[in-house]
Amino acid sequence: MENKPLWTITRVLEWTKQYFANKGIENPRLDAEILLCAVLKCERITLYVHFDQPLDDTELAEYRSYVTRRANQEPLAYILGTKAFMKHSFKVTPAVLVPRPETELLVESVAKAAVGAGAENLLDIGTGSGAIIVSLLDLLPQSKGCLLYTSDAADE
């Protein structure tokens, strides 16, 4: 009987970090940790506390699938299906743009301008994930918002 190598959390992360680095992934260790946390349904601290925990075949298969997708430059948000933005987590698919950190600056600027103009109604055309309008309504609770989708796929 052949002994399979034991893939512990540490071993998987080290291998993936090197693999991602070779593929030009900007934050190889962080991305490896985020994907492994998604597979194990845990927080990142758990990876360090249980560093010697072996992964089972099902976990390895799911992780391998995620790693392959990320190595092909697919954004983490599309692999995970969600993206945190301001106070919320939004569902994202390839049919919508992934909310970016600089979009938070846009939302804050629009909120300030809306307050200054006394705007009560907001219109978001091409809503996508809804990150912009939802975040604006959080900042402007007295306002009302209207969403217009330009893609049926984004509405799903």
Regions found by a protein language model. Give the residues of each.
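A general structural signal for well-ordered alpha-helical segments in protein cores
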Residues: 13, 32-33, 63, 73-76, ...
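Non-catalytic accessory regions of SAM-dependent methyltransferases
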Residues: 1-40
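A short, hydrophobic C-terminal helix/tail in secreted or cell-surface proteins
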Residues: 152-156
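Conserved AdoMet
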Residues: 36-112
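Residues at secondary-structure transition points
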Residues: 7, 30, 58, 98-101, ...
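Conserved SAM/SAH cofactor-binding pocket of Class I
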Residues: 102-151
